């Protein structure tokens, strides 16, 4: 085991069962809500005319981003060490920097993540591909993201803290990969790459 792996193992070992369970429930709630919206979007997609597909793609992307596990309630470290304890004793703060520090791993990720959402929201141009291709891409993105969210819910109960953080990082990466970035302008692709880069140090 590398020194870094040992540090992460030690950080995760400090989390108690109650905090881990609270974070699990927070993640599951987000997955359940996302699946609800994805099923709704799936039913509506077939009725979306070509001139509305770009707007639909933006809505899908923002709904997905808004339901990913990035909030404090989905992090066992934030649950245990946040609020009243002000991050004192937090193993994630020790290994990745305090989340309220501008240069911490989480701050750099959430800044890039928020910028991606802003770029998608402000992308009001037209489709960058043929409407038929856009529809197929959206069908794939919705179907695949729904499966990933369901898998995440199924996996999460049996995971320890270290495994949960690893699984969450992988889930974030997989879901962000399913954004229909090909349908948007070049700024979205650049923002997407930045999020990917910041995810390398998420855990």
Spans of features found by a protein language model:
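Cysteine-centered metal-binding/redox modules
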Residues: 2-203
């Amino acid at each position: 085991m590398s020194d870094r792996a040992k540090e992460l193992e030690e950080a995760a070992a400090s989390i108690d069962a109650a905090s881990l369970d609270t974070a699990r429930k927070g993640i599951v709630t987000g997955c359940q809500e996302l699946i609800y919206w994805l099923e709704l979007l799936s039913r509506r997609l077939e009725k979306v005319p070509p001139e509305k597909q770009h707007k639909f793609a933006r809505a899908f992307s923002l709904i997905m981003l808004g339901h990913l596990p990035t909030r404090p309630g989905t992090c066992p470290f934030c649950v245990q060490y946040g609020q009243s304890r002000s991050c004192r004793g937090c193993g994630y703060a020790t290994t990745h920097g305090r989340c309220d520090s501008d240069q911490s791993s989480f701050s750099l990720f959430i800044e890039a993540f928020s910028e991606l959402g802003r770029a998608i929201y402000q992308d009001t141009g037209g489709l960058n591909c043929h409407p038929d291709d856009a529809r197929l891409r959206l069908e794939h993105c919705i179907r695949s993201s729904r499966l990933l969210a369901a898998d995440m819910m199924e996996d999460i109960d049996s995971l320890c803290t270290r495994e949960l953080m690893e699984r969450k990082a992988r889930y974030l990466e997989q879901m962000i990969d399913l954004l229909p970035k090909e349908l948007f302008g070049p700024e979205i692709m650049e923002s997407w790459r930045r999020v990917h880069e910041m995810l390398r140090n998420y855990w």
